[in-house]
A protein has these predicted regions:
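Conserved N-terminal beta1-alpha1 strand-loop-helix module at the mouth
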Residues: 1-200
Length: 200
C-alpha cells in the first residue's frame, strides 16, 4: 500500500489521486517547504487523508483534523505518550527517526497507542530529507503495530522495495524524491514507480 506525502497543489492532488494510492499526506508544520498554509481547492475523496504535525498543540490538531476531514494524524515530532493518549478518537501514525538499531526501540513508548508507526531517516530537519537509512536495522522491530517504510525512497528503488520484507511492513511512504519542486509531485515518475512495484 502506498502513501504519498507533502501534497499541496489542487491539480497535482487530483492527478496523484488517480494513480490509485492509499494515503495522501498534507503537512501542517509551518517550517516545512511543503506547508499547507491554506485549504487547497481540491482534496482527495478516493484515498485517505493524513495530516502531518510536529509538536503542535492539541487544540490545533483537532481543529485541522475536523476542518480537513483527516483520516489519520501523523505525529512527526517529540510528542509524548501522554500527548498521544489525549488524541483519543483519532487514528494516529507516529513517526520514528532512525539512524541505527538503537533508534528502533523508541517504538516501545507508543506501542498500543497508535495505529501505525512510520520509520523515517533521522535528519536535522523533520522528514523530507531524501536520504535513506539502512533498512536492515528494522529487523530489530518486534512490535505488534504495523509500520510504513519511509525515508528517501526514489524512482530507482522499486526492486529494492519489492525485495524488502518484514511481517509488519504494510505501506511505503513517498515524498521528496518524486518532486518537481517542494509540494509538487512528478506524476509520471510516480506512475512508473507504482507500475514497477505492482509488476510480478
Amino acid at each position: 500500500m502506498i502513501k504519498v506525502c507533502g501534497m499541496r497543489e489542487p491539480d497535482n492532488i487530483r492527478a496523484v489521486e488517480t494513480l490509485g494510492i492509499d494515503l495522501m499526506g498534507f503537512i501542517f508544520w509551518p517550517k516545512s517547504s511543503r506547508y499547507v498554509s491554506e485549504r487547497p481547492a481540491y482534496l482527495p475523496t478516493h484515498c485517505k487523508r493524513v495530516g502531518v504535525f510536529v509538536d503542535e498543540d492539541l487544540e490545533t490538531v483537532r481543529r485541522i483534523a475536523d476542518e480537513y476531514a483527516l483520516d489519520y494524524i501523523q505525529l512527526h515530532g517529540h510528542e509524548s505518550r501522554e500527548y498521544c493518549a489525549q488524541l483519543n478518537g483519532l487514528k494516529l501514525i507516529k513517526a520514528i527517526s532512525v539512524s541505527g538499531h538503537d533508534d528502533i526501540a523508541t517504538y516501545k513508548t507508543y506501542e498500543g497507542l497508535v495505529d501505525y508507526f512510520l520509520f523515517d531517516t533521522k535528519c536535522p530537519s523533520v522528514g523530507g530529507s531524501g536520504q535513506q537509512f539502512d533498512w536492515s536495522v528494522l529487523s530489530a522491530y518486534d512490535g505488534s503495530t504495523p509500520f510504513l517504510l519511509s525515508g528517501g525512497i526514489g524512482p530507482d528503488d522499486a526492486e529494492r522495495v519489492k525485495a524488502f520484507h518484514h511481517s509488519k511492513c504494510i505501506r511505503i511512504d513517498l515524498n521528496s524524491r518524486f518532486e518537481l519542486s517542494p509540494g509538487l509531485k512528478d506524476v509520471a515518475a510516480l506512475r512508473k514507480f507504482l507500475n514497477e512495484i505492482h509488476r510480478k
